[in-house]
Amino acid sequence: MQPNDYIEANRSMWNETADVHAQGYVSQLLERIKDPDFRTFDDVEKRIFAHMGLDGKAVIQLCCNNGRELISVKKAGAGRCVGIDVSDKFIAQGRHLASLGGVDVELLRSSVYDIPPDLFGQFDLVYITIGALGWLPDLEAFFGIVSRLLRTNGQVFIYEMHPILNMFDANKGLTVEASYFQREPFVVAEGTDYYDPAQVIKSVSYWFPHKLSDVIGGCLKHGLSLTHFEEYAHDLSMVYAAFENLGKKPPLSYSLVARKIA
């Protein structure tokens, strides 16, 4: 398969997932989003955003899903806010949520590899959250795009599941099921929804087990200098939550901030 074939397959999966979320999870958001104090941030995000400052900054979120996190960023004082996602239906959900919340954000349906060039060099912050990087077939090209989106001295903030978790099946505990160095994508023929595990997602999708060095190396290769990195014992994915209770456990998530130096 070619990279675009993977992207289109994953797009179909996300559109199916959006339909599932519209039946339950999104209805819960519809009321919450109207609250001026609505935020999705946990303590890690609060601390990092407080340190870097959001006031008036131009922010773009890649793989933004339905935009709820971007809406939070806007409500926290950011300036121009743009969200990119491959799913038509999640972008439509996001526009509806933003309208209900009275929030001015721009949500664009696009693969991250096909972002309009007129967005390059326009942002102070690229924001990437849980469940984004594993759906991308070419991480090096992705970080090249991240760099082009940023102004000089702009920052990228990544808050993601730790890639070591790709070695484990969440239902089998800490039994190693895959090599950390696997390059072939995992094929998900029938997955379950992360908000409602009773719902089966039938579309075939592809998850790429990138190494942590792929993330850090991608930043460094494209002129993004690390200013912060930390690993955590809490799960962001809702898949490995049971691992939090293990006495001996691997890292479950991490945060990374890097600055464009040229």
Label for each model-derived stretch:
Residues 124-140:
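A short SAM/SAH-binding and catalytic strip from SAM-dependent methyltransferases
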Residues 58-115:
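Class I SAM-dependent methyltransferase SAM/SAH-binding core
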Residues 195, 206-230:
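Short alpha-helix
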Residues 155-193:
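Conserved class I S-adenosyl-L-methionine
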Residues 140-155:
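A short glycine-rich, Lys/Arg-flanked "PGG" loop and its adjoining helix->strand segment in the class I
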Residues 117-125:
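A short acidic, Gly/Pro-enriched loop at the edge of an enzyme's catalytic core
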Residues 1-29:
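N-terminal, positively charged/glycine-rich alpha-helical extensions of SAM-dependent methyltransferases
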